[in-house]
């Protein structure tokens, strides 16, 4: 099971649709959590659903024929054979999140997470060398899907650390 993760707005769901069109069995971790009720509660300050990641990941392991799991928490599943972290320049990400109508506080929280490599760091702490990092900035969804396909086939390697948006925080 390959897990595709990244900050909200980097293109995970769009990419998942393309991979599905290419014949892969893809599931959204967020949809699974909501549909199966893998919810522990709600964050009292931010209002986010708190997911029962262990239960969701355990359920995923039982699913047959599953190729790809996408979602911004998917890298927390220890059973991922490979993790691909999608990255996007924070200024481009800002436009996408604002376009979705995210409140300013949520936009800033996600921009900071992207600039600080939060998903990449978390993924690497759990999965080590099985993590790949792809900068989607300036690339079409199909170009990103081609890169992901190459990574999945072993013909391309995109180790973590090659994408750095930390300078955005200082600018």
UniProtKB/Swiss-Prot annotation:
SUPFAM superfamilies in the record: P-loop containing nucleoside triphosphate hydrolases
Annotated region (NMP), positions in chain: 28-51
Alphabetic keyword roster: ATP-binding, Kinase, Nucleotide-binding, Ribosome biogenesis, rRNA processing, Transferase
Pfam families: AAA_18
Catalytic activity: AMP + ATP = 2 ADP; ATP + H2O = ADP + phosphate + H(+)
One of the GO BP terms on file: rRNA processing
Binding site for ATP: 9, 11-14, 100
Classification via InterPro entries: Adenyl_kinase_AK6, P-loop_NTPase
Record-level Gene Ontology MF annotations: adenylate kinase activity; ATP binding; ATP hydrolysis activity
EC number(s) on file: 2.7.4.3
Region (LID): 99-109
Family, as annotated: Belongs to the adenylate kinase family. AK6 subfamily.
UniProt subunit comment: Interacts with uS11. Not a structural component of 40S pre-ribosomes, but transiently interacts with them by binding to uS11.
Its job: Broad-specificity nucleoside monophosphate (NMP) kinase that catalyzes the reversible transfer of the terminal phosphate group between nucleoside triphosphates and monophosphates. Also has ATPase activity. Involved in the late maturation steps of the 30S ribosomal particles, specifically 16S rRNA maturation. While NMP activity is not required for ribosome maturation, ATPase activity is. Associates transiently with small ribosomal subunit protein uS11. ATP hydrolysis breaks the interaction with uS11.
Protein's recorded name: Putative adenylate kinase
Organism from which the protein derives: Methanothermobacter thermautotrophicus (strain ATCC 29096 / DSM 1053 / JCM 10044 / NBRC 100330 / Delta H) (Methanobacterium thermoautotrophicum)
